[in-house]
Regions:
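Small-residue-biased structural context
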Residues: 1-171
């Protein structure tokens, strides 16, 4: 592959991740962009010193994370857990469990008074949980997705993922 075609492919991937509504992006590119966004928000939350900013960041995290996890469970984890390989079933079940823990921690964080020791502790735990989850998902689940689904199927998964996100209401 030439340098020019490599740059064109990289540009297409980045543009697709930035404008996922086009629906012709691999699900993994969309998930990568969303993981990066949430991890950035969590980093900012754990560094924030003001209650106002912390409250705003928690809301932004909820708006990003709740639809992401629900749609990901429907479009990625359910098909992975349905595969015949035991490792795939375990990886899928682990993803569901980590999503449940993240959701519970996020709801706890949302109920706490910002800029208190309890709030800061919950924010730190949520960040650590998401960091761990993303690392494992990107290593294990994504390998399963690449191994078991064609590029066309992954593009369809992306369209399904984006549609599923629109159906999720954020509390």
């Amino acid at each position: 592959m030439s340098v020019r075609s490599s740059i064109e492919q990289a540009t297409k991937t980045v543009m697709g991740a930035l404008s996922p509504s086009q629906g012709e992006t691999d699900i993994l590119d969309t998930l990568q962009a969303e993981h990066d966004e949430v991890q950035d928000l969590l980093q900012r939350l754990t560094k924030s010193e003001t209650a106002r900013e912390q409250k705003s960041l928690v809301n932004q995290i909820k708006q990003a994370l709740v639809p992401h996890t629900k749609a990901e469970e429907e479009v990625v984890y359910t098909p992975i857990a349905a595969l015949s390989a035991e490792k795939a079933k375990i990886d899928g079940a682990e993803g569901f469990t980590e999503h449940a823990l993240a959701s519970a921690t996020l709801m706890q964080l949302d109920s706490l008074t910002p800029n208190t020791p309890e709030f800061k502790a919950a924010a730190k735990v949520l960040k650590e949980l998401i960091d761990h989850h993303v690392k494992e998902e990107e290593r294990n689940i994504w390998a399963q997705v690449k191994e078991n689904f064609s590029s066309e199927q992954r593009e369809q998964m992306n369209r399904d993922f984006l549609a599923a996100k629109k159906r999720v209401s954020v509390p």
